[in-house]
Amino acid sequence: MANLYDLKKFDLNLLVIFECIYQHLSISKAAESLYITPSAVSQSLQRLRAQFNDPLFIRSGKGIAPTTTGLNLHHHLEKNLRGLEQTINIVNKSELKKNFIIYGPQLISCSNNSMLIRCLRQDSSVEIECHDILMSAENAEELLVHRKADLVITQMPVISRSVICMPLHTIRNTLICSNRHPRITDNSTYEQIMAEEFTQLISKSAGVDDIQMEIDERFMNRKISFRGSSLLTIINSIAVTDLLGIVPYELYNSYRDFLNLKEIKLEHPLPSIKLYISYNKSSLNNLVFSRFIDRLNESF
């Protein structure tokens, strides 16, 4: 049995703050995730240092690193805090969150999005809110840390102590044009293709930038006559003009009959896009969420 008198003398909130500092290795980021000031985090760390008679963290380069005592404390604390959180969730099982917020690029609407939604909706009580936003891995981590999203889909892996990230899907790109294009045929040469005007997706995402650099090398000095931040806008513009564009194959396949589009065959395949799905490790303590992840893993 725990010594409740000794526990009463110790502020258990300090251990939560310690674990948050350990996860981020940053006073300021720990403060952001806990919605308190960096000063409050620093004061709590000072109290812990006095309690354990150890600095717990020391400066390392531009950041901080845990001492051996800090490492040992985290080793034991992580399991105990997870167990405490699971106990609270079990007691409040009826109040567990069942509204899932997903952030991801428009690309998911034409790939494995249906699989995600299907896995979530196997629990009929789940409500889903989906935001079509292309973001960096850093912004994705911030959304997860601040609990503003349950699932985030990115084109670059999210690397964080508190986040689980895994590959979701690889999207093949293809070059398309209108089925009524007056010059492009199945036998069009590279030179004939390069004589046409192209569309381009506007994006600041590192993943898209890398792909566009490869495409720029492949179609060097091509003329870009239409730029847009929406894939649906781009594909609709291609359908009603003589423009050529590079879009995800699944998107083309979904709309080719309705919009009278055709694929332009190339000698070598275009670069593909990898998608990653990320979520907080602590979310697995939620029974509804953990079951969803199990279903998702079974679908791969």
From Swiss-Prot:
One GO process term, biological-process aspect: regulation of DNA-templated transcription
Annotated GO MF terms: DNA binding; DNA-binding transcription factor activity
DNA-binding residues: 27-46
Domain of life: Bacteria
Keyword Metal-binding applies: no
Ranges where the HTH lysR-type domain occurs: 10-67
Keywords annotated in UniProt: DNA-binding, Transcription, Transcription regulation
Induction: Induced by LeuO, a monocistronic operon. Maximally induced in early stationary phase, repressed by H-NS via 2 binding sites in the upstream and coding region; H-NS may bind both regions to form a bridge which then prevents transcription.
InterPro entries membership: LysR-type_TF (IPR050389), LysR_subst-bd (IPR005119), Tscrpt_reg_HTH_LysR (IPR000847), WH-like_DNA-bd_sf (IPR036388), WH_DNA-bd_sf (IPR036390)
Further remarks about this protein from its record: The protein is quite variable across different genetic subgroups, probably due to its binding and repression by H-NS.
Stated family: Belongs to the LysR transcriptional regulatory family.
Protein's UniProt name: Uncharacterized HTH-type transcriptional regulator YbdO
Lineage, opening ranks: Bacteria, Pseudomonadati, Pseudomonadota, Gammaproteobacteria, Enterobacterales
